[in-house]
Curated annotation (Swiss-Prot):
Residues 30-61 are annotated as: Alpha. Keywords: Metal-binding, Metal-thiolate cluster. A divalent metal cation 3 binds at residues 15, 19, 24, 29. This is Metallothionein-1C. It comes from Sus scrofa (Pig). A divalent metal cation 1 binds at residues 5, 7, 21, 24.
Length: 61
């Protein structure tokens, strides 16, 4: 379990836009991918890396 998230690793949960999970692995949590991913990014992947600019990361360029 992520100490900052109430759901189990790899489980299904409803992480809201205000989710504070730092490494949330919830399959339904889109926010956990990256803080720099634009809203609605179809390729958003959990654990992607920000490249500096607020709108660029390793999965949504």
């Amino acid at each position: 379990m992520d100490p900052n998230c109430s759901c189990s690793t790899g489980g299904s949960c409803s992480c809201a836009g205000s989710c504070t999970c730092k490494a949330c692995r919830c399959t339904s949590c889109k926010k956990s991918c990256c803080s720099c991913c634009p809203a609605g990014c179809a390729r958003c992947a959990q654990g992607c890396i920000c490249k500096g600019a607020s709108d660029k990361c390793s999965c949504c360029a």
